[in-house]
């Protein structure tokens, strides 16, 4: 029965089983030396630098210089940059340049980290690649051309598009589901051309090599020794290298007495691998985690071993050579084999055994996941805010060098946390704290930069409060919209007075509402309705009113009233649904069951349909004792049985206002509990006439509270409906494209193996309606029943598995988390039109800068003083920034400068603006919004000045797109979807056309003022 789980996936592989080895002669093994260097995981970056990472580059550079035949690939940039900037001597830097020029040292991927593929957002993947590529190009003039994604826990269908756009010629991955990998090995299907996007099809395809069952490490066991094989430098020691140079588990040295045994072991492994691939070219990775910190002993043993094998190649049937990844792919490409095509499906979820589904990390350390995304959103806003400040001309006295330092600090922190043992929540507590500290420090610097920009814009109009016992006369709020569309939304502030008057730049009253704070009993939540053009500000004065609202002529924020409902026990009752309480706006009526205090149903106005919707919290009880069975940990989700309700009673209150109505539900573990463990705060907005509130009206905003959990509990929010979903949900790959997720019954562990990552959105549907969930952080998501969708919110685990205990990876997370989901309910056409923009409205909510005022109300700059940046609704401004790179955009000129010893300009280039545009829709998804969109960049960017030049670049900016010619790989009759030819590209110019799902990157140059 186990094989039935993967038989549907195996069938097309067997049908397409290719012919055997393409040429006679010995197998050719490409030995690729590498070190897998986690940017975090168990040890902090600084601990790793001290214990082994710095020594990797120091010793590898030294040893490569000693042997012309030797090779090495470097992957992540964070450790290399720290070594380059803080450790490397001038001589070592010279040697690195020589080795790169000779092709004996090769950078692959070239990003700051090796990012996770399941729970990262595409924007952040691009950022970390751009950070690494910019450094490599500026410093060496090189551009990575191959990926080495060997350790992320599953593979996303976004990956081929990402790496193709970055200019890569081939992609290498490893971790896919164990039974699928076994089937692909048997069918010799581990190499294929991957077309990740159904809309882009072959336009952004990439040749893909999936590593075999040995993955990125050499065989750890050899038959003639009880030590590991081929790891002559042993295992890295923390906190610092041993003084005697003796490390644990050092492989036996190669000697005349055992060289035949070593050769037989290596050759046997090469032949075993060769049987799983179609050509006689075999990739043999030499290395593993934390290897090559003593490259001298490594090469001193491998050199004679390879020489010995080559001297007996005829009888052994194998020849071997040191190689970079590029050497291997070039040899493979030269064979001109016809490869099968894989379509836009991903390789998620990932399992290593029947009871080892790596689906727990989709939710692990939810607080860190949320912090990482908030930091990313703040960086996104800060980039465009600084760009608008500098162009068309700086309007204040801000030091651009200091500003770039603040931006760079947060770029680095956001890039770092995309590592596959960072945002995944699979790191030790001290490493989690390192990531959080770096993010918090970067966010603090960014907020200082934003505040400086706003003050420069406003001075001297806005007097700030001086220190006084009397306290501030009121508050001042600047609200910035980082999206390139006009946004109407609610911003929430906390104030210390119950009566408030809010006015805008012209002194006009602004729709607002005051209510008791949900977090601070002595304070109040002030809700302000704001409409902000793209990349623009609104400024508000907030002052206490003279008295209560009644009896005064002064327009003030309306006061919300609270209706409370007593605590209700959880029970099945025939009386449910007798007394329904409606909460309505112009788009929805949410009906609440007064007998249960739970949501009962939602009526959607446009389709005039009522859908039964009930939400509750459940917990999976999981095992923590390896003697009792499979366990859950940071990585794995292994429930023993179905989830059970996590509450016995629920209270409800409705806070009703003219602007917003809030439904608050508090879930208690028992009837007499003093504190609730779970909560849902749902918000519907009543958009006043005269405001375009389509997105605002068509969403139910929900914030949850979960925790602290009891030990070995995994908490989910289950939403049950009467939609006939056939137990199919759709969830996104990295916020870029959706994947269909039908429920699959497995012999073992079906609950966990039907969990999928939701990075930004998910939905389920029937023939009439669709329920959409939008998220501001990653979660695990599943449908465990027809019409059901459950989102894992939080995990708290401990187990006695020695490996987990040794590395402190038990996830005893006692925190309280506050994730947010927005719900959209409606017809397919309505939700299709709104889903993408609503998801971005959640991810990139307006940034509020809040301060105290003194004296009379200041004169504020009006909206008419700002020119908006506005794009069509199907086109997203993915980035607008000033990277500050010092290199010339002309590759020939930059290369000449490097050869002359000029490492770029002395000052950062503030004139080059990076622009990236992204078409949000798939081909055929919407009759209007899926059409190609043409824009004139001169008109779109006129608020920043006069555009004098537009250069189209590769995704990370390092290639002039007209000079980028990626390899073409021969394919058979592939399953083509979407356009089959590349759209025409006019040579330069400001008028561009962006096709469905395209991402296009430009350097924009403006007229100097």
UniProtKB/Swiss-Prot annotation:
Residues the record lists as binding Zn(2+): 36, 38, 151, 420
Record SMART domains: Alpha-mann_mid
Major enzyme class: hydrolase
Cofactor notes: Binds 1 zinc ion per subunit.
GO cellular component: extracellular exosome; lysosomal lumen; lysosome
Residues carrying a glycan: 226, 249, 294, 336, 516, 608, 670, 675, 748, 808, 812, 890
Subcellular location: Secreted
Ranges for region Disordered: 972-991
Signal sequence bounds: 1-23
Keyword annotations of the record: Glycoprotein, Glycosidase, Hydrolase, Metal-binding, Secreted, Signal, Zinc
One BP annotation, GO: mannose metabolic process
Cofactor: Zn(2+)
List of catalytic residues: 151 (nucleophile)
Full protein name: Epididymis-specific alpha-mannosidase
Organism of provenance: Homo sapiens
């Amino acid at each position: 029965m186990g094989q039935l789980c993967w038989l549907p996936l195996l069938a097309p592989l067997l049908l397409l089983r290719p012919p055997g080895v393409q040429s006679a002669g010995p197998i050719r093994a490409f030995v690729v030396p590498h070190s897998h260097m986690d940017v975090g995981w168990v040890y902090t970056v600084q601990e790793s630098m001290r214990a082994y990472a710095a020594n990797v580059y120091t010793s590898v550079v030294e040893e490569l210089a000693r042997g012309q035949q030797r090779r090495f690939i470097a992957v992540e940039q964070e450790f290399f940059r720290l070594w380059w900037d803080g450790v490397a001597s001038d001589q070592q830097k010279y040697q690195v340049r020589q080795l790169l020029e000779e092709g004996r040292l090769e950078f692959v991927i070239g990003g700051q980290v090796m990012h996770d593929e399941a729970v990262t957002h595409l924007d952040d993947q691009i950022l970390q690649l751009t950070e690494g590529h910019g450094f490599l190009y500026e410093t060496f003039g090189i551009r990575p051309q191959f990926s080495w994604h060997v350790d992320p826990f599953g593979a996303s269908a976004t990956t081929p598009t990402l790496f193709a756009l970055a200019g890569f010629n081939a992609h290498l991955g490893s971790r896919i589901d164990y039974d699928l990998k076994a089937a692909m090995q048997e069918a010799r299907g581990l190499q294929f051309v991957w077309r990740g996007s159904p809309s882009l099809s072959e336009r952004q395809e990439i040749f893909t090599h999936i590593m075999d069952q040995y993955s990125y490490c050499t065989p750890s066991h050899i038959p003639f020794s009880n030590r590991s094989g081929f790891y002559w430098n042993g295992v890295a020691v923390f906190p610092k290298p041993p003084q005697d140079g003796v490390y644990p588990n050092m492989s036996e040295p190669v000697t005349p007495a055992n060289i035949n045994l070593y050769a037989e072991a290596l050759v046997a492994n090469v032949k075993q691998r060769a049987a799983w691939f179609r050509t006689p070219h075999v990739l043999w990775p030499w290395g593993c985690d934390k290897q090559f910190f003593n490259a001298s002993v490594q090469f001193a043993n491998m050199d004679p071993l390879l020489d010995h094998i080559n001297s007996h190649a005829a009888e052994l049937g194998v020849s071997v050579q040191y190689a970079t990844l590029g050497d291997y792919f070039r040899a493979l490409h030269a064979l001109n084999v016809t490869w099968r095509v894989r379509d836009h499906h991903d390789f998620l979820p990932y399992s290593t055994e029947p009871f080892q589904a790596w689906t727990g990390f989709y939710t692990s350390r939810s607080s860190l996941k949320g912090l990482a995304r908030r930091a990313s959103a703040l960086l996104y806003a800060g980039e465009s805010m600084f760009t608008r400040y500098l162009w068309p001309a700086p309007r204040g006295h801000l030091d651009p060098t200091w500003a770039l330092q603040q931006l760079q600090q947060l770029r680095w922190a956001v890039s770092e946390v995309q590592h596959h043992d960072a945002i995944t929540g699979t790191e030790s507590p001290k490493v989690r704290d390192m990531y959080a500290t770096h993010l918090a420090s970067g966010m603090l610097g960014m907020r200082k930069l934003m505040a400086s920009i706003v003050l420069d814009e406003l001075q001297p109009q806005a007097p700030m409060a001086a220190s006084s016992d009397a306290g501030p006369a009121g508050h001042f709020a600047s609200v910035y919209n980082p999206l390139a569309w006009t946004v109407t939304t609610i911003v929430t502030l906390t104030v210390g007075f119950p009566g408030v008057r809010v006015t805008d730049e012209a002194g006009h009253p602004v729709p607002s509402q005051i209510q008791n704070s949900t977090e601070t009993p002595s304070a109040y939540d002030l809700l302000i309705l704001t409409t902000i053009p793209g990349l623009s500000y609104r400024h508000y004065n907030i002052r206490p009113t003279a008295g209560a609202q009644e009896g005064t002529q002064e327009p003030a924020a309306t006061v919300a009233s609270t209706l409370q409902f007593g605590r209700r026990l959880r029970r099945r009752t025939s009386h449910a649904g007798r007394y329904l309480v409606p909460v309505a706006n112009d788009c929805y009526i949410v009906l609440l069951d007064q007998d249960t205090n739970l949501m009962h149903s939602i009526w959607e106005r446009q389709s005039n349909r009522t859908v039964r919707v009930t939400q509750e919290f459940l917990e999976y009880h999981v095992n923590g004792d390896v003697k009792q069975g499979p366990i859950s940990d940071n990585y794995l989700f292994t429930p023993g049985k179905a989830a059970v309700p996590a509450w016995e009673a629920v209270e409800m209150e409705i806070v009703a206002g003219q602007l917003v109505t809030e439904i608050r539900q508090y879930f208690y573990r028992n009837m007499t509990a003093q504190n609730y463990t779970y909560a849902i705060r749902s918000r519907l907005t009543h958009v006043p006439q005269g405001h375009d509130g389509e997105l605002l009206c068509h969403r139910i905003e929900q914030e949850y509270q979960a925790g602290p959990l009891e030990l070995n509990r995994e908490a989910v929010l289950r939403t049950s409906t009467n939609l006939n979903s056939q137990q199919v949900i759709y969830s996104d790959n990295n916020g870029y494209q959706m994947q269909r997720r039908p429920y699959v019954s497995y012999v073992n562990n079906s609950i966990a193996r039907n969990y999928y990552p939701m990075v930004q959105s998910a939905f389920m549907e029937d023939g009439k309606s669709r329920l959409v969930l939008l998220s501001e952080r990653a979660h695990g998501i599943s449908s465990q029943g027809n019409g059901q969708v459950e989102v894992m919110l939080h995990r708290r685990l401990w187990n006695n598995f020695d490996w987990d205990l040794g590395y402190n990876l038990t996830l005893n997370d006692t925190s309280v988390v506050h994730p947010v989901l927005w719900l959209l309910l409606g017809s397919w056409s309505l939700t299709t039109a709104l889903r993408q923009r609503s998801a971005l409205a959640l991810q990139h909510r307006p940034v509020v800068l809040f301060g105290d005022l003194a004296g009379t109300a200041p004169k504020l700059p009006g909206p008419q003083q700002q020119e908006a940046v506005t794009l069509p609704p199907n086109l997203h401004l993915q980035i607008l920034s000033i990277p500050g790179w010092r290199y010339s955009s002309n590759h020939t000129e930059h290369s000449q400068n490097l050869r002359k010893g000029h490492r770029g300009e002395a000052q950062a280039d503030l004139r080059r603006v990076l622009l990236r545009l992204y078409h949000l829709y798939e081909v055929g998804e919407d009759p209007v919004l899926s059409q190609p969109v043409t824009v004139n960049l001169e008109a779109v960017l006129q608020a920043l000045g006069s555009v004098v030049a537009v250069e189209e670049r590769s995704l990370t900016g390092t290639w002039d797109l007209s000079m980028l010619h990626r390899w073409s790989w021969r394919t058979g009759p592939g399953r083509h979807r979407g356009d089959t030819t590349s759209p025409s590209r006019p040579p330069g110019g400001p008028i561009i056309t962006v096709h469905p799902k395209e991402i296009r990157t430009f350097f924009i140059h403006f007229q100097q003022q």
